[in-house]
Amino acid sequence: MKNRLSKKRNDYPGHPRVAVGAVVFRDECVLLVRRGQPPAEGLWAIPGGSVEIGETLQKAAEREILEETGVQIRASKPIYTFDVIDRDMAGKVRFHYVIVDLAAEYVLGEPSPGDDALEARWVSAGEIHNLKVSPATVNLLKNRFGFGS
């Protein structure tokens, strides 16, 4: 049972997994989700998820953002890359994601949480300081866009 759950949630991988996120702005707000699964469970972050076999980064981002938020986007070029490596108490790698965040253009839709997102919404620069936001998301938004500075 544990082995099936571990494989289902991508725990204890044999190799790093590639994942994408999409940075989407609308009316001076950024689209964020509150994660419902590890890694970053409970934190607000750029929406995204795993790339499937045969899928481009752009198509993966468009699919994942639609699944997690109900918002349609048009993804473009990579703008930020980072690793998420989480180890268990014994030091064994529990998760290892290589995450590529892409710039994206809002197309249509209103945020509604889906897939593994607990919440999804547009967040203004003024309110981002009141949320528990993942460090990678804070770094990206502040350093690349001056958002929330």
Where are these regions (language model features)?
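A cytosolic small-molecule/anion-sensing beta-strand core signal
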Residues: 26, 34
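Acidic, metal-coordinating catalytic segment for phosphate/diphosphate chemistry
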Residues: 1-21, 92
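A conserved beta-turn-beta hairpin within the catalytic core of GNAT-like acetyltransferases
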Residues: 38-44
